[in-house]
Amino acid sequence: MLQPRESDVPVLFVVFIVLPVIAYFLLGRWHDAVSKKARVSVLAQRAAEETFKVETMATPDVILPGPSLRPMPYMRSAPSARPEYHECATCHGPAKTRCSRCKSVRYCSGKCQIIHWRQGHKQTCQQWNGFGTSSSGGLPPTENTEQMPFLSNLNSPLRGSDVHLHDMDFDTMSEPSFVTTDSYNLDTSPFLSDRSNMNKPNQFLHTSENGAAIGSYEKNDYSIDGEVPSSEILSGNKGLNNSSGSGENCGNRDVIYPLNSVVHQPNNYAPEIRKRPKASITVYESDKGVYLTSDMISSGEGPYASAAESLQRSNSSGNVTGKGNMIHKKPPYPSGKVSSSQKSQEKVLTSHQYDGHEKNPHNKNEQRSTKTAVSTNSSLQGCNGISKAGASKVEALKKPSKFLKTSLVGLINDNKRSKVLFPYEDLVKFFQYEVRGISPRGLFNCGNSCYANAVLQCLMCTKPLMIYLLLRLHSKDCCSKNWCLMCELEQYASTLRESGGPVSPSRILSNLRNIGCRLGGGSQEDAHEFLRHLVMSMQGACLDGLGGEKQVEASLQETTLIQQMFGGRLKSKVKCLRCYHESERYENIMDLTLEIHGWVESLQDALTQFTAPEDLDGENMYKCGRCSAYVKARKQLSVHEVPNILTVVLKRFQTGKYGKINKCVTFPDMLDMVPFVTGAGDNPPLYFLYAVVVHVDTENASFSGHYISYVKDMQGTWLRIDDSEVQAVSLNQVMSEGAYMLFYMRSFPRPPKIYIEKGLSSVPTCSKRHSSKSSKGSKQDLNHTESLFASSDQTYGIYDFRPDNGYIQDQHAALRTRNFYHTDDAFADSISTDFSDATSSEWSLFTSSDESSFTTESTRDSFSVVDYGDNAGLDPISSIFGPYYAQDHPPGSFASCTRLSPSNPQTRYFQENTGFVSDSSMPAHLPGNVHRGRYPDRACSSSAEPPASANPRSVYGRYGLSREGFVQTSGFCQM
């Protein structure tokens, strides 16, 4: 064996250790240098772009001179050349930037700016306000530099007293022009108005013959029949010396003149112009001349208030008050924002002022992007008080109208409503309407596929999903070229419309790989895992048309039909026991998995254990962000938003041991989730059982066994489905099974979170008609209930999917689908629900726990349906369940339950198949109404009259009709 020489060790050390370390260090330095250089180049490029943008839009301070208004021939001026070199105030080198505050000092770098600032510039630097003392001040950069072609002219100093006003975009103008007259020597104010009256670059001067000129400015030329040149706007024969124009022929003819001329204004009163307050100007034209007034003159301010007196002495039959309004924005300001009042004025002006004139087609896009409000035409009221009328109209324009607010709110709501993938109103119909012509069929076992058969049977009995599949709403918009799960489920649902033998789910099972599911292949699988894959795949199929889950925002994903049915939220609250800081987190769920070990004997016990506080200690300590350490904490889970289709999974399988918990866990067929919900707007979440999945085994193990399902069809009959075998069973048999998965359907669907947050969920018609104030008397409540029942045929309907049924459209429903019509049977006016016992307390109707009983004195403060009905001034039963179900009721077997309250006895009738409820204390035509009462203390019998010898301890009973005859489904009544 070769032995290494001693001289090789240092060489190996240098080669394999020292050199790699040195190379790593050098590469790191080189990488840092390259990154720094790239970062510097990026910053320099950004600074250069910003500087170029600032230089492009830089303007000097401009004070428009003089009080004379002379028209000049229309001409376009070439842009002035800007200086290419600027000197740094510190090092006198080429300057690239300037002071962002005063806009008057330039620098070559940020370092020079800091040095100059510390040398004393911070004492002399003043905020730039549009009329500063610097000659190099300007406007800040805006988002769109193409909207300001006039800035090139303003960068050059003024020569003489000519100021070019044509092609100016007054949307971005820093200070407006001053227009005065020589005859009055007026010191007028700028063309100003409220900020809500501006932003339009395409403005014009709208004048009427011998009338007013509504002053605005048009950037583009108009094609006008008989166009009048701009030099004739103010005729030379009509001087400005006469102030007593009669204006008898005001408003005879309207003409639009392009105001693209050059205005000469001697700067005689420039100092006073700066000191004048902002005011609106009225420009009008009469037979004697053209006049300009302002509210400053009418108020007696300034040395030229006598002009207002001469103006008041003029008698005329009418006038047009025009306001040449321009709003200037001082930097910084955003671009492209249009106020609400401006939009309303713009609509009015578009219909009045642009009527009969053809616009320049090249300006359509610009007019759409940036719009402004121009003052509207008004009727001629006389020349007296022109300035006062103008001032009042300016104030009126500042206040948006109520109609405008309403229209804007409606527009916003319409836009928000469009961001919903499946309308909530249609989901309400899927929950409310009755379904006919559908009956479950068996499924062939395609090799250990009982888990899939049981889950598919439960999903096909999910009412809203079943209606959605039968209406083929997905396939109408499906754009998938490959195999689609939703389209396949629609094909399977269509087979349920026809009577026959079992069908095969082989097409679904053979394509499980296409939906990312690793189940199948003939092996035994978990039904819960298959359900999760199926629900998530249906959610993905709903989003495929929009580009997939990654392309759709999270808030929009919650508005799909699958998410609205199965989606919910859990709330996790952790409280630090050291600093008592509380943190909350929310988690989206598709089902609710509950532990059943220990003392749990019912579903309510499992929910109580799930929502009980848990101490985090030992190895499970909580890391508090405020304490910055692992501390003891207390954690509590609660259901923040319960899904509309609540899937409860009882964890019977033990992980690691392959064992199964075969203990008996009772469950109700009407579940009250009020004690376990923290959401404020989620009351009362009442759920009805409609499907159960049971795992049957003989070896008490999780790796073997068989899945069967119990489902309630659309007519309310419970069926036991074992693959291809379907048989009717009683409710008692369903309640005695060891359930693995429970499917509950909400009594009324909860709206999505986006509806609740933005207040877009419209109250259904039935809820609006059913609501009443608690202050009304019993007679008013009764009349209100009668009107509700009388109109119920317009609120509820039936989806009839029988093969012989034709296409019927509903004129009152918003959803236009096939096989739909309103209920018109004998019991259409009744309000029904499916009641059952399923309770462990003799006084409870809605939960099996004594804590939720609403008839005992000790728990009266807890929530109950009767309390809810009392607070709303409604009947306790019909107020909760009335709006939810309206089914027809074929003749069947009824049992009555009579209770005696301190006032009068009432009798209730119950039928298992249809859930029909009636009250003998109410009129005969109101079978769905139940009188409100808190102290039921009589028994039930099989007749409408209370028996003489009734057990006073019996409270509630019901009998259903099966093939063998009467089957008692409640243990609280004795026959």
UniProtKB/Swiss-Prot annotation:
Zn(2+) 1 binds at residues 88, 91, 108, 112. GO terms for cellular component: cytosol; nucleus. Residues 354-369 have a biased composition (Basic and acidic residues). It is found in: Cytoplasm; Nucleus. Residues 309-322 have a biased composition (Polar residues). The active site is at 450 (nucleophile), 706 (proton acceptor). Zn(2+) 2 binds at residues 99, 102, 121, 125. It is an enzyme of class 3 (hydrolase). Residues 441-747 form the USP domain. Keywords: Cytoplasm, Hydrolase, Metal-binding, Nucleus, Protease, Thiol protease, Ubl conjugation pathway, Zinc, Zinc-finger. GO terms for biological process: cell division; flower development; fruit development; leaf development; protein deubiquitination; proteolysis; regulation of protein stability; root development. Highly expressed in young panicles. Expressed in roots, leaf blades, leaf sheaths and stems. Expressed at low levels in brown grains. Belongs to the peptidase C19 family. This is Ubiquitin C-terminal hydrolase 15. It comes from Oryza sativa subsp. japonica. The gene is UBP15.
